[in-house]
Amino acid sequence: MTRLCQNRLAMAMVLIGVVVPTRAAAQQVEIATSVAFTEGPAVDRDGTVYFTEMVAQRIMKLTAAGVLSTFREHSNNANGLLVDPQGRLIACEGAESQRTGVRQTFKPQITRTDLRTGKMDVLADNYQGKPFVGPNDVTIDAKGRLYFTDLTGGAVYRIDGPRQLARILAAPDIQRPNGIQISPDDKQLYLIEANGAEGGARMIRAYDLHADGTVGNMRVHYNFYPGRSADGMSIDTEGNLYASAGMNQLRGTSETLDTKTGVYVISPQGKLLKFIPIPEDFITNNAFGGPDMKTLYVTAGKTLYKVRTEIAGLPR
């Protein structure tokens, strides 16, 4: 495996009134306002970054020129996003909300939006008549099949087409499935377990991914326990995972501070190759973009960061 060169933490973008210093991650972060919680970045072929802003219920849009705007209001608590090869935005909607004092009802569903026309279609909203609970994150294989997690529902599904749905993993074999990725050769599926309960699974699981879209031969790829597990992840052309994990302050769970906040670069063999510190809790997800696919966009707290990498990423 080619050794990863030193990643450089680039200047953090100033988004939604949050200012982050451009030097070392240890510097104090100045927060001008607190109005956002960023999640689920996805990058279009033209360099536009889409990400969810879960407190205000919006999907945001940042152009390659740095112009920030709202792509969609009332996002139905959208979380994980993906831009498919046809340039359509896939969204995991209706994700669970745990914000104190806020009680809202969302419709759990997977949608697909044409970025040119704005037309939105519902790809799936139930399995065998039972509604989803909290769709969280999504990825895609080379055949165009979508795989998504239902974190609170404890399941992983595959979408072969509109209303063509299969459940490939479920409790008790998995607990709280979060981020999901597929290897460049479509032979491995990676799944983040993010269970903050005492003794809960906090790891990346690896499975053999068969040609028919089913999985088997589960093994622990990387274990974050007893710290905070990863939330979301992306993958590069050499099969290395970039997992957004950890925390720098306790949040009332059994999770410890053993896992520091940052991006964990993990080889196909499950070895930690590099750690990229991110100076803000809570880190959530990341996605590759840029003309050479060597810019990693990272969502954490109220901020969208970007990091240059040596190896190009995949748009998954």
What are the functions of these language-model segments?
Residues M1-Q6:
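N-terminal secretory signal peptides that target proteins for export/translocation
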Residues A25-R316:
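Sequence-structural signature of mature extracellular/luminal beta-sheet repeat domains
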Residues A10-V20:
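Bacterial N-terminal signal peptides
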Residues N7-L9, A24:
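Hydrophobic alpha-helical segments, especially transmembrane helices
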